[in-house]
């Protein structure tokens, strides 16, 4: 059995790490490189960086900090933000990123997933999915351009259909960003994760809602996700990564202990 992964997420805007609640009202957390170094030293399995306004601004991720991160950490990291071409991806990977993640650009042009997978291999192509639960209809819908609340829009895709579509096109991993739970710290949406897991045949990463160590355990034990991504509990030092991993190990979760 592959070890489960603990993945801190760093949302980047204007060269700094920020964090919002349900993708809104972002506050500044701190500088990118020191935070990345701290999480690597605490035992994170990998890091994810989202340049959250790149797609809505019509630009690619700011590459200046990618190489600086690569110099100070020795764990894999993934970068996302406005990657719309093979050239964009090649530059980011050449600066030291191990994976690239696409979200809004994939919705705008689904063929991008296949072109990236064919060029760089499925192992480094992650598709992020921003999913919102509509209580009135009882359905999960995919959102686009979520980094800018004034431009966020609901797409025609229901979440489960999009999960299946991106796999057909070559996604090597899926990060499910559950917008209703984002930053609230009341736990992952286990029901949604279970539904997605049924149709997902590539590694599935849960994102949005972690508030306690038990929430991570539930995601691994009850929804059988491959990794759990979180931000605010790590940024605000509510949970220490090494302590989290020790706890998960005592609960029988296969996890890499530093």
Curated annotation (Swiss-Prot):
Belongs to the HisA/HisF family. HAMAP family: HisF. One of its GO terms (cellular component) is cytoplasm. This is Imidazole glycerol phosphate synthase subunit HisF. GO terms for biological process: L-histidine biosynthetic process. Its main location: cytoplasm. IGPS catalyzes the conversion of PRFAR and glutamine to IGP, AICAR and glutamate. The HisF subunit catalyzes the cyclization activity that produces IGP and AICAR from PRFAR using the ammonia provided by the HisH subunit. It is an enzyme of class 4 (lyase).
